[in-house]
C-alpha cells in the first residue's frame, strides 16, 4: 500500500474514532439541537417529508436536508435520539475531512495533508460543529467541497 493510502486510512480511522463514539454520550446541550431534532421527529410521526413542521404547527426556517438526514438515520436506528440527530453532522465532517485530505495531498504532498487534516480535526469550532445537531457542518461540507 502506498504512503498516501496509509496516511488516508490513518486520518480516516483517527477522525472516525474521535467523532463517532461520543455522539450520544451527552444530552442536547443547546436550544438549537432539540429544535432540529423535533422537526425530524415530526417528519417521522406525520409522514410529511415535503414541508418540515415543528410539532405540526410552525414551518421550519432552515433548508430541509438536515431534517431529512436526521429523519432517515433515525428511521434506521428506530427513533430520534441524540446519537441519530448528531450523526448527519458527523458524517458531513468525515466527508469534508476526506475531501480536504485528498485535495491537499494532490496539490501539495502527503505529509502536508496529514498535518493539515490533524489541524482540522483538532480545531475547536470545527469539532464542535461536527458533534452537534446543527446545519453548520452540512453547509460547511457543501461550500468547501464546491470549491
Predicted features along the sequence, with ranges:
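Membrane-integral, polyisoprenol-dependent glycosyltransferases
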Residues: 2-144
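Active-site Asp-x-Gly
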Residues: 147
